[in-house]
Amino acid sequence: MKFKDFFVIGTDTDVGKTYVSTLLYKALKKYNFQYYKPIQSGCFLKDGKLTAPDVDFLTKFVGIDYDDSMVTYTLKEEVSPHLASEMEGIRIEIENVKRHYEDLKKKHSNILVEGAGGLYVPLIRDIFYIYDLIKLFNLPVVLVCGTKVGAINHTMLTLNALDTMGIKLHGLVFNNYRGQFFEDDNIKVVLALSKIKNYLIIKNGQKEISDKEIEKFFN
């Protein structure tokens, strides 16, 4: 398998981007992958310091210690990063994010970067968005999408935006699949419209991605 760094984004806020990132990291950790969350809002105090909930979830799920090196900016307010940073008087410096990413690359073979929501989430008001960060890192995207009603529209809009922006798609991950007939049709329609061949389906409650699936997805 020829691994490379990649950037995980979602079609919507609650599509399960962190859960999918966690399953991917769990499967790829043995290949010296590292997880990186550049900016996390909605953080909570634990042992006197702000803790990133996504990092906390991932490390507990995988069974490793919480790792401060997995996140650059931790913000308390549970709102978009640009607004949380304004409310808390914290200036987001993209150069710090870039430097952190480059430092991680020196220690690990590959990096799995998890964004904050979708492509148009602002990191710095009117200046810098998630899609800018993807372009800065020059990474292909793993797009996490749902399977429920509305998934076709959300997924196709994001795919079209990626194409317009010139951002490469590595593959799709259909998350939280429950085996309903309309989910099967939603997946079928998205794949037919997009002509995408590289995808994963994560079932509701799935705890791991098999080596066979990983090999196929990253081959």
UniProtKB/Swiss-Prot annotation:
Enzyme Commission number: 6.3.3.3
Pfam families found in the cross-reference section: AAA_26 (PF13500)
Location(s) in or outside the cell: Cytoplasm
InterPro entries per the UniProt record, alphabetical: DTB_synth_BioD, P-loop_NTPase
Keyword Phosphoprotein attached: no
Annotated catalysed reactions: (7R,8S)-7,8-diammoniononanoate + CO2 + ATP = (4R,5S)-dethiobiotin + ADP + phosphate + 3 H(+)
GO cellular component: cytosol
Uppermost EC category: ligase
GO process annotations (BP): biotin biosynthetic process
Cofactors (names): Mg(2+)
Protein name: ATP-dependent dethiobiotin synthetase BioD
Species per Swiss-Prot/TrEMBL record: Fusobacterium nucleatum subsp. nucleatum (strain ATCC 25586 / DSM 15643 / BCRC 10681 / CIP 101130 / JCM 8532 / KCTC 2640 / LMG 13131 / VPI 4355)
Lineage: Bacteria, Fusobacteriati, Fusobacteriota, Fusobacteriia, Fusobacteriales
GN (gene name): bioD
